[in-house]
Swiss-Prot record:
Database matches in NCBIfam families: rnd (TIGR01388)
PANTHER family: RIBONUCLEASE D
Gene (name only): rnd
One protein family per Pfam: DNA_pol_A_exo1
Name assigned to this protein: Ribonuclease D
GO CC annotations on file: cytoplasm
Organism: Psychromonas ingrahamii (strain DSM 17664 / CCUG 51855 / 37)
Length: 369
C-alpha cells in the first residue's frame, strides 16, 4: 500500500493543490479520555486511489485543508465522532456526506455495520483492527499503526460505489442522501447549556426545586468542561448531580456524606453550594415544570405496540432494519411531541424525525400529524 505522510505546512499545501472534484474518503484517529474535545492524532484521506496521512501534531494549522473540502463529496464510515472533530476544527460541515455505514443500513446489511465487516462483505478482504485502541497522539507512530490508518480509508470509495449501485437498484439512494444530510444538520445544532440537564437520568424523581438545581448544575458543569477541556464526568459525575439535586446539601460535610469524590469537593465544592443557594433563593415560578415520563402515560404501552406493528410491516415491505426506520428513540420523540405539547406548541416546534423526510413518506404519514 503506497501513501504519503504529511508533516509540514508546505507538504500540506502541495497536497491540497492535487485535490480535484472526485469524492474524498476521510477518517480520523483521535484520543478522548479525560478531555471534552477529542485530540486529533491523525487524518487519513484517499482520493482516486491515492492515500495521504496528515500528521496534525507535526503540521499544526490544518485550516487550509478544512477550507479545501468545502462543498466536496466526503465519504466516511460511522461518521458521528469524525463529524464532531471536523466541525470543531473547521467550524462548519459545508460538504456533502456519504456515510457508508448508513448505506449498509438502508441495504439491511446491519443497522451499525463496522468498517471491517463491510469490507469483508463487499471486497472479500479481511481488515486487521488490532490498532484500534492505540494512542494516536503518541509519537513516533509505528509502521503497523500507519498501515492500519491507511487501510481505514483504502476501501471506502470502492465500497461506496457498490453500495450506491445497490441503493439505486432498491430505489433508496435519495433516502440515503437525505439521511446523510440530516446527520450533518443535527451535528451543527449547538448544545444549549440551559437544556444540558435534560440529558440526565431519573429527572422524574425530582421536584421542581430539585429540577431547578440540577438544571443550574448541569449548565455550570457543561460550561466548566468546555472552558477547561475536561470530560463532563471529570468535573462532576452525572449521578452526583442528581444526588445534589435530590438531597440538596448545604455544607461541605454534607457533600462528603453524599460520597462525592474528594476532587469534586476540593475543586468545586464551594461553587456547587453557591449555585444551589442561588437557585433556592429564586422565585418558584422560575423553576422548570415536573418531568412526566412517557412510560407513565396510560396509553403508552398500547400505542407503542400499535406503532411498532405498523413499522414492522413497513420495514418488511421495504426490506429495512426496524432501528433505521423508527428506533425506540424516534418513536419516543414522536410521542413526546404528540402528548407533551399543546396544539399551539406543536405548530411552532421542530417536527419529530418520524414526521419529516423519507420516514414520513414511508411510514410517518400513517400516524397522527
Amino acid at each position: 500500500m503506497q501513501f504519503e505522510i504529511i508533516t509540514t505546512t508546505a507538504q500540506l499545501h502541495d497536497f491540497i493543490a492535487t485535490l480535484d472534484g472526485s469524492p474524498i474518503s476521510l477518517d480520523t484517529e483521535f484520543v478522548r479520555t479525560r478531555t471534552y474535545a477529542a485530540n486529533l492524532g491523525l487524518l487519513q484521506i484517499s482520493q482516486n486511489t491515492q492515500i495521504t496521512l496528515i500528521d496534525p501534531i507535526a503540521v499544526g494549522d490544518l485550516s487550509s485543508f478544512w477550507q479545501a473540502i468545502d462543498n466536496k463529496n466526503i465519504i466516511l464510515h460511522a461518521s458521528s465522532e469524525d463529524l464532531e472533530i471536523i466541525r470543531d476544527h473547521k467550524g462548519d460541515l459545508n460538504f456533502t456526506l456519504f456515510d457508508t455505514q448508513i448505506a449498509c443500513s438502508f441495504l439491511n446489511m446491519g443497522a451499525s455495520l463496522g468498517y471491517a465487516k463491510m469490507v469483508e462483505t463487499l471486497e472479500a478482504v479481511i481488515v486487521d483492527k488490532g490498532e484500534s485502541r492505540t494512542d494516536w497522539c503518541a509519537r513516533p507512530l509505528s509502521e503497523k499503526q500507519i498501515n492500519y490508518a491507511g487501510v481505514d480509508v483504502l476501501y471506502l470509495q470502492p465500497c461506496l460505489e457498490k453500495l450506491q449501485q445497490q441503493l439505486e437498484n432498491k430505489k433508496m439512494f435519495p433516502f440515503f442522501e437525505q439521511e446523510c444530510q440530516s446527520v450533518l444538520a443535527q451535528k451543527m445544532v449547538k448544545q444549549d447549556p440551559d437544556k444540558a440537564y435534560k440529558l440526565l437520568n431519573n429527572l422524574f424523581k425530582l421536584d421542581r426545586q430539585g429540577l431547578a438545581i440540577i438544571k443550574a448544575l448541569a449548565k455550570w458543569r457543561l460550561l466548566t468542561a468546555q472552558e477547561r477541556n475536561l470530560a463532563l464526568n471529570f468535573v462532576v459525575k452525572a449521578d452526583h448531580l442528581w444526588l445534589l439535586a435530590y438531597y440538596q446539601p448545604t455544607s461541605l460535610d454534607d457533600l462528603r456524606r453524599l460520597n462525592l469524590l474528594p476532587n469534586e469537593i476540593r475543586i468545586h465544592g464551594q461553587q456547587i453550594l453557591t449555585i444551589m443557594t442561588q437557585v433556592i433563593s429564586q422565585d418558584e415560578s422560575t423553576y422548570p415544570p415536573l418531568v412526566n415520563r412517557l412510560v407513565d402515560f396510560p396509553a403508552y404501552k398500547s400505542t407503542v405496540k400499535s406503532m411498532r406493528d405498523k413499522i414492522q410491516l413497513c420495514a418488511e415491505k421495504y426490506d429495512l432494519p426496524l432501528e433505521l426506520l423508527a428506533s425506540k428513540r424516534v418513536i419516543n420523540e414522536y410521542l413526546s411531541w404528540l402528548w407533551k405539547l399543546t396544539n399551539l406548541q406543536r405548530q411552532t416546534a421542530n417536527k419529530p424525525k418520524l414526521l419529516t423526510g423519507w420516514r414520513f413518506e414511508l411510514i410517518g404519514h400513517q400516524f397522527e400529524h
